[in-house]
Amino acid sequence: MKPENKLPVLDLISAEMKTVVNTLQSDLPSWPATGTIAEQRQYYTLERRFWNAGAPEMATRAYMVPTKYGQVETRLFCPQPDSPATLFYLHGGGFILGNLDTHDRIMRLLASYSQCTVIGIDYPLSPEARFPQAIEEIVAACCYFHQQAEDYQINMSRIGFAGDSAGAMLTLASALWLRDKQIDCGKIAGVLLWYGLYGLRDSVTRRLLGGVWDGLTQQDLQMYEEAYLSNDADRESPYYCLFNNDLTREVPPCFIAGAEFDPLLDDSRLLYQTLAAHQQPCEFKLYPGTLHAFLHYSRMMKTADEALRDGAQFFTAQL
């Protein structure tokens, strides 16, 4: 679609979303648009420091977990000694960016609002690691904590997965992987999905929305996909195009959150409609006036805080 035909998104977003967009960090260098992925990762980490400040304090522990690919870093957030469940969090970043620091505040708030242990998994990024390595390492970490739950003093009898953007895809893909391969890591009580992509290659929102403000132009989305997948055939894998998986049975209860001006919104709508049509437990909530990635901005946006509280409430209601 010609750029001129797209919606004037920055004129339509909410006042609090505009405040975020217009917030300048004077000590931040320019985005390295033509830089290496390493430079973009470094910038992303620096840019997120401001948005992660002021998060709740709680007991936090870091562990390296063995997988067949090597060790993966994990971080445990423990809001109380007797947690009713454990939530595994998978960060967004287009499969190529992000780490446990860039999503620290999100994980802390989720732990605080749910009063559950949250475990962030620093899964391997692309293009160094190609599909399905990230999913396999996530599953390995989940299995490790299930086997060692007593040693780590965590409750793995009931678990959940949560993630934003690319992390939302990894969240649902990991839950389906466990189901399909009959791997027991505890009962999956719920899955929390904020503005994910689930397999659509084109849609109305992908045509009308997306630009330099969110890093989700058609070219951006293609770049993320090419970095993540090993080959063209992977596009149809049921763990990448999740609509090619069986969504008619034994899908854990899903909280599906959409951002109004997100080009990936139709992925969330289709996922909800598919699950609902087959009587799979799910809830969809649209957050008006928001852009993709708004969950990061709870320092300024009540809507971001609300979205985290909604996800936490959904999860605890399943326990």
Swiss-Prot record:
Q: What is this protein called?
A: Acetyl esterase
Enumerate the NCBIfam families for this protein. Answer: PRK10162.1
Instruction: List the active site.
Output: 165, 262, 292
Share what the entry says about its subunit structure, partners included.
Homodimer. Interacts with MalT and MelA.
Q: Which UniProt keywords apply?
A: Cytoplasm, Hydrolase, Serine esterase
Q: Name one GO cellular component term.
A: cytoplasm
Q: Does the keyword Cytoplasm apply?
A: yes
PANTHER family in the cross-refs: AB HYDROLASE SUPERFAMILY PROTEIN C4A8.06C, ALPHA_BETA HYDROLASE FOLD-3 DOMAIN-CONTAINING PROTEIN-RELATED
Where, by residue number, does the polypeptide cross the bilayer?
Answer: none
Q: Which GO terms describe its molecular function?
A: carboxylic ester hydrolase activity
